[in-house]
A protein has these predicted regions:
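Hydrophobic faces of well-ordered beta-strands that scaffold small-molecule active sites
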Residues: 1-7, 29-31, 61-66, 103-105, ...
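Active-site acidic/histidine proton-transfer and metal-coordination neighborhood
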Residues: 11-19, 55-56, 73-175, 281-286, ...
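Short amphipathic alpha-helices and their capping/turn segments at secondary-structure boundaries
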Residues: 14-22, 43-58, 87-98, 157-166, ...
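Glycine-rich, proline-tolerant flexible connector loops at the mouths of alpha/beta enzymes
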Residues: 31-55, 108-113
Length: 315
């Protein structure tokens, strides 16, 4: 087992992301944004500079976590699908150069003006995800699906249906402990309750190959819409983080665990002031504190953290 992190929540530039990673004694970054650019959108010169910086620092990319079929992509819009496909085709050769074998992908947004799981719409979603996964499979890349604000994130049932429909060894699950804290369990009739992280995790455990650590609290809204989360340190919200970490240990989990705090900056919030020195300093310090608190939580859950590099084993 190893630790990683979305270090762009600490620093926008790669040098800063490498710095906080090494300060923690870790060796991996889950790459998302570098100075506002993605692996699939930076030019060749920018990528070569990134590759050199990582090599010199001895830091690796365990997963590319960006915009493929995410919550901004409509399943009915072919231009959204083509954008995801283009990003994937651009990113894969660069992932291969970096030795990165996992992509964090999703399963398109849930439309507000129609049922998100009608048989007709499911057919569209399954076909498009299948095509993206096939590209990954043909290139030795694993498509790790995250339970976010997407079709698969509607409930554990939808995620399991997606697994059955895609039916590929290159399609596995990235389980995010915090996303069920504010996503609705869209099964049965409205009003839908908020999901249980523990239920989602337990139902999908056999397919989970990577874990994102996030935690939050949220109260149901009177109108039945998705509630607004307040992000917390891991273990302080309703994400069942401790129970999940104990179960991962007891079930012999040996994959990666990536920090995605959101307590210093909400990645989806484009209006936040991210440029002030005070904001930059806060994001860096809160990211480091989050990661250190989580490693302590891991020890409390029976994990033994082995030396440098962010590796762990069960006690």
């Amino acid at each position: 087992m190893f630790f990683s992190g979305f270090a762009d929540e600490a620093c926008a530039d790669l040098a800063g992301q490498i710095e906080v990673t090494k300060e923690l004694g870790w060796r991996y970054i889950e790459l998302r944004n570098v100075d506002g650019k993605m692996l699939g959108t930076m030019d060749d010169r920018e990528f070569e500079a990134l590759e050199q910086q990582l090599s010199e620092a001895g830091v690796s990319i365990n997963c590319y976590g960006r915009a493929v079929a995410n919550w901004a992509c409509h399943p009915r819009k072919d231009e959204d699908f083509e954008k995801s496909r283009k990003e994937l085709l651009t990113a894969i050769p660069r992932m291969q150069k970096l030795g990165c074998k996992m992509l964090r992908g999703m399963s398109f947004l849930v439309p507000e003006d129609e049922p998100g799981d009608s048989p007709e719409l499911e057919g569209i979603i399954f076909a498009k995800v299948r095509e993206l996964v096939k590209i990954c499979e043909d290139n030795g890349i694993v498509y790790g699906h995250e339970n976010c604000m997407n079709y698969g994130g509607m409930s554990y049932v939808h995620t399991l249906k997606l697994i059955d429909a895609v039916d590929s060894p290159a399609f596995t699950l990235i389980f995010d402990t915090g996303n069920p804290c504010f996503n609705l369990r869209q099964l049965g009739s409205k009003p839908y309750p908020i999901q249980s992280s523990w239920e989602f995790y337990r139902r999908c455990r056999p397919f989970i190959t990577h874990v994102h650590i996030k935690d939050a609290v949220a109260l149901p809204k009177a109108d039945g819409s998705r509630p607004d989360p307040r992000y917390t340190f891991a273990g302080d919200g309703t994400g069942d983080v401790r129970a999940i970490m104990i179960d991962l240990r007891e079930s012999g989990y040996d994959g990666g665990i990536t920090m995605e705090p959101h307590v210093g900056t909400v990645f989806h919030d484009q209006n936040a002031d991210k440029d002030s020195e005070e904001a930059k300093s806060f994001r860096r310090s809160i990211y480091l504190e989050y990661c250190r608190r989580f490693t302590q939580l891991m020890k409390e859950c029976g994990w033994f953290l082995e030396g440098p590099g962010g590796h762990a084993a069960k006690i």
